Amino acid sequence: MNKRAVAILLVGMISSGMIYFHPVYAHNFGGDESASFFAKVAEIKTEINFISKHVSDSNAIDYYSDALGEYWNANDTREMEERNALLQKEIPATINSTISDARSGNQAAVSTDVSQLNGYLDEAIPVRIDKDKLNNSTVHALAVTFVLKEVLEKYGDAINSTVNLNDISQINMGGNVQQMSVPIVDQLKYENSMGLATAAQQLFNDLAAKNTDKSTSNDKISAALTKLLQDLNNKADRNTVMTDVHIKIHPDLVSAYNIQTVPEFPMPALLIIISIVAMITITRFRSMKLRQ
């Protein structure tokens, strides 16, 4: 391949990158195992509580058992085994017992199961989370964002949204946007989004109570979470709900609790960099051959 061909190829790739490049504005908070586990506990408690409210309802039990399977799987059991063999056994066993008792219509047994599971999950927190992160306010705040991500995912499915509600770039920022109610196409996912939003609010309330020095930010975040629940209850359009989370909650949560966002690297930009490196390499290789 001669230099002219390489140059033409490079120009084409750079042009394509410029055409298709756009910054990703979605809040990407990265991963943190401790925050993920705090969120996981809140999510499991939410789903198991819904099972207790839908005893004998096979459709609801199927839905929430699938949700539980997402939040607690074989990998979670394996990781718990490394810390506590008893909890490694009891947590999945009690989840299964709750589902089984709910299918058989045994409300009393389900209530006992739920109480036991909540106890096991509470025990699991100091077992699974290292001491230096157990009372870390940033970790707890990050857990709130993880649960809110699930809220948006479930609500998007509930209203059959054609866009990803977790992508902030999909918000219509125009001044003429009017709030409106939308039809719910999946009642269970709608119910789930409400329950998870309540769980996120409770997580934040617990966090705020331990961080009274952040009262101004806490008040703003608390008000925004209350509005989110109101808008979900009113079946608000996706733009309203996304604004609640991305514009009203996230910025104050990030600044008040020092959450680090992780910028995403757009693929076209990466393609440009790779192309430049490739051209430099080819040019150097040709120069070496000419010297021989």
Predicted features by range, described:
Residues 1, 37, 42, 281-283:
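Short alpha-helical segments used as structural interaction elements across diverse proteins
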